């Protein structure tokens, strides 16, 4: 209860960021901002409450899942205000969010393996570097610091590198020695990295590489969908394997 009270007091602080504008029923992108904001809040409370159900070695993983959705919720409070009041894409807020949450998501792969088997710390370093390269060049392309196409290609190459490390490199080698439940969760998380994260390049392409056909509306709608899938579903997979492994302990 104390944790919930603290959490509630903290998340109540940015409510002023919601803005005073009305939400147009035909603004599906604006609606998606509000839906994702609510879902992230609910997920954050859920992950922190569920920590009490799992054994000690899984608590860190659920804490990180709660941090991912909590940080994203905080930034979505501001992003939705920017969109409703101005109709502009909240690029800076979004990349600040990703700069914090994407490395944490990558960290989850390391944590889930470390909880079940021995895994080298070098894997985390490789994934961290790959995620930062992907984000930095993605931001440079969206902010106009460098040409959109080269930034897009470099970011995608970093994403492919992370997939390789997890699917065929050190991550897969460590996963092969884990329990069936952990292996199943790991493989499901891999599919999210491959297919769920593929939604982000689609949004980037739609917003910046389609010439006159691009739009901030489509860009943000796709990005919001991607955040919903990748942040919340990712955490639910961690929660599921943590509960199963704890009950079998």
Curated annotation (Swiss-Prot):
Keywords: Cell membrane, Chromophore, Hydrogen ion transport, Ion transport, Membrane, Photoreceptor protein, Receptor, Retinal protein, Sensory transduction, Signal, Transmembrane, Transmembrane helix, Transport. The modification N6-(retinylidene)lysine is found at residue 231. It is a multi-pass membrane protein. The record marks 108 as: Primary proton donor. GO terms for biological process: phototransduction; proton transmembrane transport. The keyword Ion transport applies. The record marks 105 as: Responsible for spectral tuning. Changing residue 108 to Q: Changes in the photocycle. InterPro entries: Arc/bac/fun_rhodopsins (IPR001425), Proteorhodopsin (IPR017402), Rhodopsin_retinal_BS (IPR018229). The keyword Membrane applies. SMART domains: Bac_rhodopsin. One of its GO terms (cellular component) is plasma membrane. The record marks 97 as: Primary proton acceptor. Contains one covalently linked retinal chromophore. Residues 1-17 form the signal peptide. GO terms for molecular function: light-activated monoatomic ion channel activity; photoreceptor activity. The chain crosses the membrane at residues 30-49, 62-84, 99-121, 128-147, 151-168, 189-211, 221-243. Pfam families: Bac_rhodopsin (PF01036). It is found in: Cell membrane. Belongs to the archaeal/bacterial/fungal opsin family. Light-driven proton pump that generates photothrophic energy. PANTHER family: BACTERIORHODOPSIN _OPSIN, NOPA (EUROFUNG) (PTHR28286:SF2), PTHR28286. It presents a fast proton release and an alkaliphilic photocycle, consistent with its marine origin and the near-surface environment where this bacterium was collected. Transport occurs only at pHs above 7 and is unidirectional. This is Green-light absorbing proteorhodopsin. The lineage of its organism: Bacteria, Pseudomonadati, Pseudomonadota, Gammaproteobacteria, environmental samples.
